[in-house]
Amino acid sequence: MAWRRVLSQVARNRSAYAICNEIIYANPSRILRGDTIAGGTLRNLHERYQSSYVGSFARRMRQMDSPSEASLLKEIYRSDPERVIQIFESQPSLHSNPSALAEYVKALVRVDRLEDSTLLKTLQRGIAASAREEENLGSVSENLGSVSAFRSAGQVTKDGILGTANAPIHMVTAETGQFKEQLWRTFRSIALTFLLISGIGALIEDRGISKGLGLNEEVQPSMESNTKFSDVKGVDEAKAELEEIVHYLRDPKRFTRLGGKLPKGVLLVGPPGTGKTMLARAIAGEAGVPFFSCSGSEFEEMFVGVGARRVRDLFAAAKKRSPCIIFMDEIDAIGGSRNPKDQQYMKMTLNQLLVELDGFKQNEGIIVIAATNFPESLDKALVRPGRFDRHIVVPNPDVEGRRQILESHMSKVLKSDDVDLMIIARGTPGFSGADLANLVNVAALKAAMDGAKAVTMNDLEYAKDRIMMGSERKSAVISDESRKLTAYHEGGHALVAIHTEGAHPVHKATIVPRGMALGMVAQLPDKDETSVSRKQMLARLDVCMGGRVAEELIFGDSEVTSGASSDFQQATAVARAMVTKYGMSKQLGFVSYNYEDDGKSMSTETRLLIEKEVKCFVENAYNNAKNILIKHNKELHALANALLEHETLTGAQIKNILAQVNNKQQQEHAIEAPQKTPAVPSSPAASAAAAAAAAAAAAQQAAAKAKGEIAGIGS
């Protein structure tokens, strides 16, 4: 019944709407259609009827929803959206159906006629006019009813389905029942995307990336080397081995005449910084041939096959410029031992290198020189005879080599007359050429910061101590008790080292914090050592125990600190090596034991015996250090006081302090000897007690005097 009432009302409004339409648009008179009072009145009447016509059913749309008609339009929409538009516009009864209206809007969107629909614009104005009329009634209930009706029937229309000029509709329809079509569409999109990316990648690989990586450009040799063998110091044996390669590059016929063949590859082996790269440049400079330089890491990129291609290009360019030298630094980056688990592209580069080393003729004039710090990691096929079949060891320089290297670097800086490079060379055992170059550079920077005119010996000593012992932390806040304990601790180390046969000479003692240590005693050998004797190892154990013994003698057993933990670790390691590696234990004999495999290679009894021997070595060292410090107690006090005052003492200053203490003791004994009167013979025990008391009094007096006179030493 409600539907019929709405239809009748719509019919009445429609008749009025038709009359207005006929009067306004069918009348040929310009008066009615122009901008006159009559024309304006008729147009207002026309708009009012339009609003009444549309607004009358907009307020009752909730009651007029016909599912059957909307379903019919929905089915027709799938195949023919134009038909949906025609049906909706030709049947006014559907205008009050929200579902039908939604299908009509969808059809307009699909055929792209949303902006051209006059009926849709009329519906929008009618809904807006209806809302305004409901608001003017003033009734809360009618307002709620109007809003509810408008929301239920026109919520989608107001908020987005009908759209506006400022907020156009964006609609995506998902059709049901077409899963296979959607799946095929998705698969087709993915396939096309993959083909597109593959094509672009191939194009970039062929044109763009290859040019960017330099694969299409011919490999060019490095700049001509001006380095000569005379510039390389400290590796005389390695230079002698490489001279024959220089002779071959200068005069190949000299060797080929007698059928001689030079190695295809030369592998330079040695620690970092020993001058392997400099030797290769010296060969190129001496022979005067093109020099191709590369690094093992330069061959690999993110693209598979780039490494092998670069190897081919490198050797192809070298063949065009033979005789020449190819130098590969850090060859272990590509020449490491092959593993079945490695990626295929990693093997391709190494395989190509192996082929190139065997691929060119032996007398072609191409010498391949490689350098590595880890020869044991190289693939066996790479170092076999016929490839890198000659290994030249480039070790750290000896004392004479270090002096030559220092002279070479010091020739480039201003130095004072007091510089003695032999002293620096003796004090830098184990330094490589790069370390010595860094030492000279640090000294030059120190002199420049101080405003000096030339580099002095003190600058070189400062640089050496900074490299070997770490930078000073003078800003660290340390209590007086801690400084005093550190002074006696380091004094104990130094004193035991001085009075123990086989110990290295004391180079410097300091209580200035360096690195993580509060103080340290540096010992340097007089010359380079190739092996260590049993006496030297036992002396090293005694020196390690000197710090803890000094703490016990001066401060008591209850005041010892954890500062000796590193000393104990070092002593234990030396003692264990003497027992398990060097065969220096009479109990275990000349047997080597692997102590680092958790005891798997030895029995429990053997392990206990090893621990017993290690403990015996350490305890003997402790007793030796204790006897030395008790005997030289005055020297310990004098040395500790000097460290507290000056913080750092050199080996020569320490010897001067000890010599002054000994001289004072001798003078005191010489003065006291004539003053003694003949004593009445007494028992041996009484004589010994009297002698001990006299010695103790003399020791206290000498210590007091030494403490007052030590201030002028070490300045």
From Swiss-Prot:
Q: Where is the transit peptide?
A: 1-18
Q: One GO biological process from the UniProt record?
A: protein import into chloroplast stroma
Q: Residues that bind ATP, according to the entry?
A: 270-277
Q: Does the keyword Phosphoprotein apply?
A: no
UniProt KW Transit peptide keyword: yes
Give me the ranges of the annotated region Disordered.
Answer: 665-685
Identify the GO cellular component terms for this protein.
chloroplast; membrane; mitochondrion
Binding positions for Zn(2+) per the UniProt entry: 489, 493, 567
Where is this gene product found?
Mitochondrion
Which NCBIfam families does the record cross-reference, listed alphabetically? Answer: FtsH_fam
| Family to which this protein belongs | In the N-terminal section; belongs to the AAA ATPase family. In the C-terminal section; belongs to the peptidase M41 family.
Name by which UniProt lists this protein: ATP-dependent zinc metalloprotease FTSH 5, mitochondrial
| Origin species | Oryza sativa subsp. japonica
